């Protein structure tokens, strides 16, 4: 009799075990990532105007013995426009307000990512290797989307790991770039070098 009771208890334990788990998400991972990329694409390309990219090149550095800042030290402004896989870019680092066009793609790396695939002298300025900058200058051409809040898209550079932002440009592109260059000249004339 003990044998039957033991077998009955053993079988009841086996039948009560279920290897099935409830799904945590309603959609599969591939569908979720596709929808996230699509939402960022709609935000970027849905805006007819320009975006201001606050760009922080360089591997995250420390300053005066203090811990490394997430945005490195100093930043640059790029003005970009996204449409149909093409990006138009201009920046304060250029001597003119001329725009340059190249291509970009969306992909999944550590998260939803935008990559500037083709060479663009403006966007690749900090990626350019020369005799002076043998390891380039820590620039990024791939950015991971972190979040979108109140019209501000927060990105993280895949190379530098620095945080950067994209905000909608409300004024004139050329006026913004000219004002940035004017401020740089004012600092240089005072013996200060803008970071």
PLM ranges: what are they?
Residues 13-16:
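C-terminal motif of bacterial Sec signal peptides marking the signal peptidase cleavage site
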Residues 19-103, 107, 111, 173-190:
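Acidic/polar, low-complexity intrinsically disordered N-terminal segments immediately downstream
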Residues 58-64, 97, 122-127, 160-166:
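Short, surface-exposed beta-strand/loop "edge" segments at domain boundaries and coil↔beta transitions
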Residues 90-141:
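Contiguous, well-ordered beta-strand patches that form the walls/edges
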Residues 144-148, 155-195:
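Ser/Thr/Gly/Pro-rich, low-complexity flexible regions
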Residues 2-7:
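Sec-dependent signal peptide recognition
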Residues 47-59, 122-154:
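Cys-His-centered catalytic/binding microenvironment captured across papain-like cysteine peptidases
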Residues 89, 114-116, 151-157:
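Generic recognition of long tandem-repeat/solenoid scaffolds
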């Amino acid at each position: 009799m003990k044998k039957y009771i033991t077998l009955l208890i053993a079988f009841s334990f086996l039948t009560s075990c279920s290897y099935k788990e409830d799904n945590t998400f309603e959609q599969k991972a591939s569908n979720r990532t596709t929808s996230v990329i699509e939402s960022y694409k709609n935000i970027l390309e849905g805006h007819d105007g320009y975006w201001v990219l606050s760009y922080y090149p360089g591997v995250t550095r420390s300053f005066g013995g203090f811990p490394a800042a997430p945005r490195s030290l100093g930043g640059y402004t790029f003005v970009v426009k996204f449409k149909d896989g093409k990006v138009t870019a201009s920046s304060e680092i250029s001597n003119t307000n001329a725009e340059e066009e190249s291509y970009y793609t969306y992909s999944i790396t550590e998260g939803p990512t935008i990559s500037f695939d083709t060479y663009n002298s403006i966007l690749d300025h900090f990626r350019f290797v020369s005799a002076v900058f043998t390891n380039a200058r820590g620039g990024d051409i791939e950015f991971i989307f972190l979040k979108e809040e109140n019209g501000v898209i927060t990105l993280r550079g895949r190379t530098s790991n620095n945080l950067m932002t994209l905000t909608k440009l409300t004024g004139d592109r050329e006026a913004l770039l000219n004002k940035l260059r004017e401020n740089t000249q004012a600092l240089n004339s005072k013996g200060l070098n803008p970071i």
